[in-house]
């Protein structure tokens, strides 16, 4: 997917946890240990936490000068870290409410600037509720439920679908172990 966007001169952002930076940096480097050297990847790597920072530097980039809305593709490694949805933190005396990383990603990268596509990667998804999955999916449709509702071609909204799925799962999980089967869940 990255190569496809790169071949069309599109700008690519990879957001990853700090511990994965070296992996992503190796894949775009001229290092001998780069297994994808011939692909000549070109993308920008930032940490998930960089979204909340307004100053300082990250991997040689001045964060004050980054145009977050200029990326055609954002690849989110360990995307389950964005499962909690949008929240704004405020204190009683706080005149400057702060958006969490999820809202920073949505507002600064996905919604602003060029039309941005989202590729979410997670080998070990940690979803505690169906709402966690819904929040991740919302990144792909810019948090605008009407967009996905129009495409679903169902009588239920995306919110209703996830609410019903959670209710069905809750009923199933309350069953005795002997009755908690895949068939019982799908019925």
Cite the ranges covered by each PLM segment.
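SF2 helicase/translocase NTPase motor core
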Residues: 1-110, 114, 120, 144-187
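Conserved active-site segment of CheY-like receiver
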Residues: 123-125
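A short helix-turn-beta junction within AAA+ P-loop NTPase domains corresponding to the substrate/partner-engaging
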Residues: 133-146
């Amino acid at each position: 997917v990255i190569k496809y966007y790169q071949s069309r001169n599109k700008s690519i952002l990879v957001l990853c946890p700090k511990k994965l930076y070296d992996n992503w940096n190796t894949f775009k480097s001229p290092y001998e240990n780069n297994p994808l050297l011939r692909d000549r990847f070109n993308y920008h790597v930032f940490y998930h936490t960089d979204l909340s920072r307004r100053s300082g530097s990250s991997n040689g980039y001045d964060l004050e000068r980054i145009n977050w809305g200029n990326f055609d593709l954002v690849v989110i490694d360990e995307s389950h870290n964005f499962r909690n949805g949008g929240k704004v933190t405020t204190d009683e005396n706080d005149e400057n409410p702060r958006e969490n990383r999820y809202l920073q990603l949505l507002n600064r990268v996905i919604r602003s600037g060029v039309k941005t596509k989202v590729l979410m990667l997670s080998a070990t998804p940690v979803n505690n509720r169906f709402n966690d999955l819904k929040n991740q999916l919302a990144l792909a449709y810019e948090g605008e439920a009407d967009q996905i509702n129009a495409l679903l071609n169902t009588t239920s909204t995306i919110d209703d679908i996830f609410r019903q799925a959670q209710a069905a799962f809750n009923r199933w999980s309350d069953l005795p172990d002997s009755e908690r089967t895949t068939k019982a869940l799908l019925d």
